[in-house]
C-alpha cells in the first residue's frame, strides 16, 4: 500500500512554470548545438511567448538572435539583436549583440543600382557600437567592415558619374566625379575617375580643367607606361576638341558678322 501511495504521489507532482521553461530552453539549446537553427528558432519563439518571469528570457532572446544570424536571416537577426539590446542592456552579451547587429546590417541585401539605405543603416550601427564601446577589442573588425561600407558608397558615386557621362550629361557627371575624388581620395576607381572627369570637361568645352585633371593623373601614374600612353592620347583628344571648338566659334562669329551686314544693307 505504501509503495502504491508513493507512486501515486510522484505521478501527481506537477512541473513548475520555471521547470517547464528550463526544459524547453535546454531542448532548444541542444538543437542549437546540433546546428538545427530552424527548429531552434521555433522552440525559442515559444519560450519568449510563454516564459516571462522565468529567468530564461535573456538566454532565449540572445540564442534566438544567434540562430537567425547562423541562418543568414539578416533582417530578422538584426531585429532580434536590437530587441535583446533594448530589453537587456546590462547583459554580458549586450556588446556582442550590438556588434552582430551591425554585421547583420552589413549583410542585408545590397545592390549598386538600388538605394543605399541598408548601407547607411549599417554605417550608423557600427558608429553607434564604437561610441558605446570605445575600448572594444573588435575595433579592427569594425574598421574592416566600415571601410567596405565606405567603398560601397564611393562605388555608387562613381557609377552614377559614369551613367551621366553615357547619357551625355557631362555637367552632372562632373559634379559626381568631383564629389567622388574629394570625398574618397583613396578609392579604387580614383585613376579612372580622373580620366572620366577630364572627358566630361572636354565635352563641356572646358579645356583647362580637363588638362588639370589629366595632370593629376600623370603625377599619380608613377611611370606606368600604359597610363602615360592613355594620358597622351587624352591630351591629343583635348587638343583636337579645342581646335574644333575654336573653328566653330570662328564660324559662328563670321556668320553673325554676315548677318549684321545683310541687315544693314536691307535698311
Regions found by a protein language model. Give the residues of each.
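Acidic, polar-rich low-complexity tracts and alpha-helical solenoid repeat scaffolds
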Residues: 6-267
Amino acid at each position: 500500500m505504501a509503495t502504491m501511495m508513493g507512486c501515486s504521489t510522484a505521478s501527481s507532482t506537477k512541473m513548475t512554470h520555471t521547470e517547464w521553461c528550463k526544459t524547453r530552453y535546454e531542448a532548444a539549446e541542444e538543437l542549437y548545438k546540433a546546428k538545427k537553427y530552424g527548429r531552434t528558432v521555433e522552440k525559442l519563439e515559444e519560450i519568449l511567448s510563454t516564459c516571462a518571469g522565468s529567468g530564461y528570457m535573456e538566454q532565449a532572446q540572445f540564442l534566438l538572435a544567434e540562430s537567425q544570424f547562423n541562418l543568414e536571416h539578416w533582417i530578422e537577426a538584426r531585429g532580434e539583436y536590437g530587441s535583446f539590446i533594448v530589453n537587456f542592456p546590462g547583459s554580458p552579451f549586450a556588446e556582442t549583440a550590438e556588434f552582430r547587429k551591425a554585421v547583420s546590417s552589413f549583410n542585408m541585401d545590397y545592390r549598386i543600382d538600388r538605394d543605399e539605405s541598408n548601407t547607411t543603416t549599417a554605417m550608423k550601427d557600427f558608429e553607434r557600437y564604437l561610441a558605446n564601446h570605445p575600448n572594444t577589442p573588435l575595433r579592427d573588425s569594425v574598421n574592416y567592415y566600415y571601410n567596405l561600407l565606405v567603398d560601397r558608397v564611393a562605388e555608387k558615386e562613381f557609377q552614377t558619374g559614369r551613367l551621366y557621362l553615357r547619357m551625355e550629361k557631362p555637367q552632372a557627371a562632373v559634379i559626381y566625379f568631383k564629389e567622388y575624388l574629394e570625398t574618397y581620395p583613396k578609392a579604387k576607381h580614383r585613376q579612372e575617375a580622373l580620366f572620366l572627369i577630364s572627358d566630361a570637361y572636354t565635352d563641356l568645352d572646358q579645356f583647362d580643367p580637363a588638362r588639370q585633371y589629366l595632370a593629376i593623373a600623370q603625377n599619380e601614374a608613377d611611370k606606368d607606361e600604359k597610363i602615360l600612353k592613355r594620358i597622351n592620347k587624352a591630351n591629343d583628344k583635348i587638343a583636337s576638341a579645342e581646335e574644333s571648338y575654336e573653328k566653330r566659334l570662328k564660324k559662328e562669329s563670321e556668320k553673325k558678322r554676315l548677318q549684321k551686314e545683310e541687315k544693314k544693307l536691307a535698311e
